[in-house]
């Protein structure tokens, strides 16, 4: 289904993100989708991501974790996972000189507006207010991005886009990248740490051999994808799994469900970092809308997990505050409270 964009499309007036940021690679299919996505393909390749952003991400992760190290306790989503996702995406888009709090404010406004549109913006005054605030946030972000497009810094992934897309098109796609790059990467890091700290045996394997961290991240993505569902819209009458679907029907795909398909994964509800086929997960979707930022998200998660385990000795969950992933669409723990040793050996 995710491969068949002709029958199940994202290009539909009900697509809430497009109402906020305009048409982008996320909300288009076919030739229009290809034209919007193509200029971003090279800068988002693994080698480009590593060359442009690995050193920055490593330094930023070290700074964030070192800042909390003396305290012996903390909440990792807000102290590390979220701030790292914000600063890396700001750097990636050429907004590295912008206050991260400002970038987060724009992001929060856009997210609230997308959620309001999805819930029918006119239904309540609160939704209408969120839509208005989101439009203002996107306008401010757009103004900053226009300056970047006019003179992109070398690290900006927008440097290769200039000329291939109009300024408005580049900005719409940058807005989508900001939205996805913060929300899902924050969840990806938080979920990976929750899974490791909840599984002492698997954690011991990683501590003994840090080369297993990428495998742990893939297994975490399988068990709890940060984006659990995606929507598609039927373009014609069809059948799917024995169900009759009419043209115009909205079809919600459960990525989380597919990732626990017992026909594909043995013991699918267990966290096993040595699972041989964990990478067959669909956490980054599939087909023409496979996540463009997958390499960047993996880089951030790998560095974040490695830095946390390296700098925070005897890292463990704070049992006074149970944590579990929450959310229908985007899933992550609301709080991830942990403790660690501050003793100097």
For every predicted segment, state its role:
Residues 1-345:
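Cytochrome P450
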């Amino acid at each position: 289904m995710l491969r068949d964009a002709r029958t199940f499309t994202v290009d539909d007036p009900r697509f809430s993100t497009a109402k906020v940021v305009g048409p982008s690679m996320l909300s288009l299919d076919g030739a229009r989708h290809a034209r919007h996505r193509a200029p971003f393909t090279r800068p988002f390749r693994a080698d480009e991501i590593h060359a442009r952003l690995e050193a920055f991400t490593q330094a930023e992760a070290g700074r964030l974790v070192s800042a909390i190290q003396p305290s012996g306790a903390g909440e990792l989503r807000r102290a590390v996972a979220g701030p790292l996702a914000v600063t890396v995406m700001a750097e990636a888009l050429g907004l590295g000189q912008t206050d991260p709090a400002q970038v987060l404010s724009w992001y929060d406004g856009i997210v609230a507006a997308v959620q309001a549109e999805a819930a029918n913006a006119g239904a309540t005054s609160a939704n209408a207010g969120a839509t208005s605030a989101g439009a203002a946030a996107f306008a401010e972000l757009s103004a900053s991005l226009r300056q970047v497009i006019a003179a992109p810094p070398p690290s900006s992934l927008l440097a290769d886009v200039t000329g291939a897309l109009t300024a408005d098109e580049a900005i719409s796609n940058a807005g989508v990248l900001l939205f996805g790059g913060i929300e899902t990467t924050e969840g990806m890091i938080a979920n990976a740490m929750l899974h490791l700290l909840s599984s002492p045996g698997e954690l011991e394997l990683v501590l003994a051999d840090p080369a297993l961290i990428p495998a742990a991240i893939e297994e975490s993505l399988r068990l709890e994808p940060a984006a659990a569902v995606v929507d598609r819209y039927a373009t014609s009458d069809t059948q799917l799994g024995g169900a009759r679907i009419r043209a115009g029907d909205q079809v919600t795909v459960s990525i989380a469900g597919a990732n626990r398909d017992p026909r594909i994964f043995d013991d699918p509800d267990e966290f096993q970092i040595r699972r041989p086929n964990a990478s067959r997960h669909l956490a980054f979707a599939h087909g023409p809308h496979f996540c463009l930022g997958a390499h960047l998200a993996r880089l951030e998660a790998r560095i974040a997990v490695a830095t946390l385990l390296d700098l925070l000795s005897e890292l463990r969950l704070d049992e006074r505050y149970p944590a579990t992933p929450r959310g229908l669409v985007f899933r992550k723990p609301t709080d991830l409270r942990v403790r660690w040793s501050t003793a100097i050996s």
